[in-house]
Amino acid sequence: MEEYVYKDHRKLRLGYTTGTCAAAAAKAAAGMLLGGEAVEWVELVTPKGIPLKLPVEHINMSQESVTCAVKKDAGDDYDVTDGAYVYVTVSKIAQGFETDGGEGIGRVTKPGLDQPVGSAAINSTPRRMMVELMMEEADNYGYEGGLKAVVSVPEGVAMAKRTLNEKLGIMGGISILGTSGIVEPMSEAALVDTIRAELSMYHAQGQKDLIITPGNYGEGFLTDKQKLHLEHTVKCSNFIGETIDMACGFGMSSLLLIGHLGKLVKLGSGIMNTHSRQADGRMETLASCVLLAGGDADLSRRILNCNTTDDAVEVLWVTAFLQPAMEQLMRRIDSALKSRAGEDMDIEAVVFSNRYGVLGKTPGAEELIMLHRKWL
């Protein structure tokens, strides 16, 4: 596929989703079943409006069914399913057009996801695409009966171990995904969709008190230092503001945000997307907290010249300004979080560093920590 986007001064090649692969294979298999002749290529237009012509491989034809595969191409995106073959077997049925999952396709075991409990983890858009394309082939050949498409990915069980599927309650394989049909490298929308899916799952389970953490540092601190488990934890990456918004939309009661100073210090200046591409402001925020805590311009200047927040913490520690500066920072973080969340959801934060442990907590953080500890 030769379509590109430009991000961070890089030219990145687009790819296509497992959903597009399944839809293309379903169309090809239906056409071969009804027409009786093998095809080498299949054409379709993705929901994003991009036309594709994809090679059809691993064809197995019989009177009752046809199986074929389309190879997933994720472009320049890192994707565990890149290079996987998505197989579809199409067979005739009395009436209607059906889709299901076979080998390597997960099954939904928890409510709140795109598909109901018990269904194959094939999302709505790929299902719709498969049905529409099979109907199109039936019309082309004047076929008035029904067709059923079963999707399989032989390596799906192994691939699923490198995804969030098990945590989301999708067991036994991967999901067939895609809303636009196109994989966009470094897609923020895809990450936010994953966060939304986790929140939706917890909402459907009636779990209204969650821990959120930007990444692996936070998860490690939770388990090793705070003795909290990860069962009710959502990894929000850099999208703290959007996670808060979505949690409010799902009617969550509380969020406990736990993260490294290097990320959460930005909240002290109201920066709710903590990716360095969006904004920095780490040292400026800490320097202003030093001034608010009674420090002088020389100390603030030393903070501004630090390369990392760990370096800044070291300076504050040796000058006995760590605690007062962190108190000022936590006041600002508390204000920013509560302003974003509004009055309907409680939100608290814990900030830590790898060397010095907990650096600060918002006023109600300890209460939420105890709430989560009681579930251990």
Where are these regions (language model features)?
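Generic domain-boundary/flexible-linker signal
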Residues: 110, 160, 221, 266-268, ...
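Short, amphipathic C-terminal "tail helix"
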Residues: 346-376
